[in-house]
A protein has these predicted regions:
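S-adenosyl-L-methionine-dependent methyltransferase catalytic core, i.e., the SAM/SAH-binding region
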Residues: 2-311
Length: 311
């Protein structure tokens, strides 16, 4: 871990040219054993930091990058241009991984990586509507070209019980009922269309208290998960990804909150009960102190790795 922290300090200066810093970069690429060479899937291509590290790990490595965000793919194509046809780009949700691997790798790959977090590029783009910290349209769609329902339309049409369920389940929000009631009551005065409208409504409904997170943090997380059906996507990925691995292949997943991590932990535990799979890190790996200080987004990250071992 000390060595990885030193490596992280070196990487930080190299990565500061982009807003988004990949989390657990060395740990995840080492977990995939990418230095052995092979075909890998980055199921959440994002800014391309993990994909680039995999491509650097071996001169013959090929990365199939999947992302439902067309803007992210366009940016990353420029970043990885030097790698030519070793980098393949697919605009799709990662629940489509089985058909993607069938099309581009004859059904089997040496490793799969999924970083389940929202990228800094998405959060900092006010027009995407992910953040309560700046005013923007209440959108939150990962793929506005293919997804019809934005956060604004979802909140305008859902029942109070549905909204409460999202807040309670996806945001683990203890004031879910109170906030849901306030959202529905607001409809009498007009639709919530802006991020600051929703954030202000939650703040008026729930006392900020002393320090800690903004009171709208859990609400925004919950609505984002609902809009993008994120946990359904994760469940579908975890169901099909293990069978896409060659013998010795690995699946590495980085989660950022307890709901995701619980899904990953339970899935890996169930797979490991079979003689075909090994849960490589029983408790997972968390970022070193240097990474957390330099990139606060990483503080809740946890990496879990599953290995296919049929010999």
């Amino acid at each position: 871990m000390i060595l990885l922290c030193r490596q992280y300090r070196k990487q930080l200066s190299e990565l500061m040219s982009t807003r988004h810093l990949p989390v657990l970069l060395d740990e995840s690429v080492q977990g995939l054993r990418a230095e052995r060479g092979g075909v890998f899937v980055d199921a959440t291509l994002g800014g391309g930091g993990h994909a680039e590290k995999i491509l650097e790990a071996h001169p013959d490595n090929i990365v199939i990058g999947i992302d439902r965000d067309a803007q992210a793919i366009a940016r990353t194509q420029k970043r990885l241009e030097a790698y030519g046809d070793r980098a393949i780009y697919v605009h799709a949700p990662f629940s489509s991984i089985e058909s993607v691997v069938e099309q581009h790798a004859n059904g089997k790959v040496d490793g799969i990586l999924a970083d389940l977090g929202v990228s800094s590029d998405q959060i900092e783009d006010r027009d995407r509507g992910f953040s309560f910290m700046q005013d923007g349209p209440l959108d939150m769609r990962m793929d506005a070209t293919r997804q019809k329902a934005s956060a604004a339309s979802l909140l305008a049409e859902a029942s109070e019980d549905e909204i409460e369920s999202w807040l309670s389940t996806y945001g683990e929000e203890r004031f879910a009922r109170k906030i849901a009631h306030a959202i529905v009551k607001q409809r009498r005065f007009g639709q919530l269309l802006r991020t600051t409208q929703l954030a202000d409504l939650v703040e008026r409904t729930v006392s900020r208290g002393m320090g800690g997170h903004h009171p709208a943090t859990r609400t925004f997380q919950a609505i984002r998960i609902a809009v993008n059906r994120e946990l359904d996507e994760v469940s579908m990925l975890l169901e099909c990804a293990p069978r896409l691995l060659v013998d010795g292949g690995r699946l590495a997943v980085i989660s950022f909150h307890s709901l995701e991590d619980r899904l990953v932990k339970n899935s890996f535990r169930n797979e490991a009960r079979s003689s075909d799979f090994v849960n490589v890190y029983k408790k997972g790996i968390v970022p070193c102190s240097d990474e957390v200080r330099s990139n606060t987004r990483s503080r809740s990250a946890r990496l879990r790795v599953l290995s296919k071992e049929t010999t």
